[in-house]
Design a protein with these regions (language model features):
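Recurring C-terminal helix/loop segment of individual leucine-rich repeat
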Residues: 50-53, 101-104, 129
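LRR N-terminal entry segment and analogous cap-like coil->beta motifs
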Residues: 78-122
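Extracytoplasmic electrostatic interaction patches
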Residues: 104, 108-176
């Protein structure tokens, strides 16, 4: 009787241990990203309740998106740099896997702007770990040329990296 009880307890302990290890592995391999529409981020409902840091971040994002900045463009394997110490990197989904080896001036990039060109690309992934060599990167901004939702963009985001804010915008028409 004692042997059976011991075996049952041992089996229960083993099962719980394996389950908890799998749960930990799953939670660290992918993270749920909070993707927000850029217009919602840039126009907070009540700026009086925003911290000074949050307001500075909003101003920084506005400046990066709307003001002329030194920029790198990387499309179809071709890197073009305009200005010294680029802060913006413009690219498309098809070019992401080559960014680490192709981009020469990474140290000052604060925002990567990724263009989605068709709805089939929503089935692809954006692995945030691809951006780990961009030391000053803070923002990922996804511009979609077709209707999409924050949830659809969230489903594309994989990889563990909590330091980036991820935004999106639907912008039909030519953005280049």
């Amino acid at each position: 009787m004692k042997t059976n009880t011991f075996i049952i307890l041992l089996f229960t302990f083993y099962t719980v241990t394996i389950f908890s290890q799998n749960s930990t592995r799953i939670s660290t391999s992918t993270t749920s990203r909070n993707v927000i529409a850029i217009d919602d981020y840039l126009t907070p409902l009540n700026s009086a309740n925003q911290s000074a840091v949050a307001l500075l971040n909003i101003q920084n994002v506005k400046s990066l998106i709307y003001d002329a900045q030194p920029s790198t463009y990387y499309f179809s394997g071709v890197e073009k740099i305009y200005g010294e110490k680029p802060k913006n990197l413009f690219t498309d989904l098809n070019s992401l896997n080559n960014l680490n080896s192709a981009i020469t001036l990474k140290n000052n990039i604060e925002i990567i702007i990724i263009k989605l060109e068709n709805a089939n690309q929503l089935n692809s992934t954006i692995n945030l770990e691809l951006f780990s060599s961009f030391k000053n990167l803070k923002y990922i901004y996804i511009i979609s040329s077709f209707d999409t939702t924050a949830q659809a963009i969230t489903n594309m985001i994989v990889g563990k990296n909590e330091i980036y804010s991820v935004f999106y915008k639907v912008e039909k028409g030519d953005t280049n």
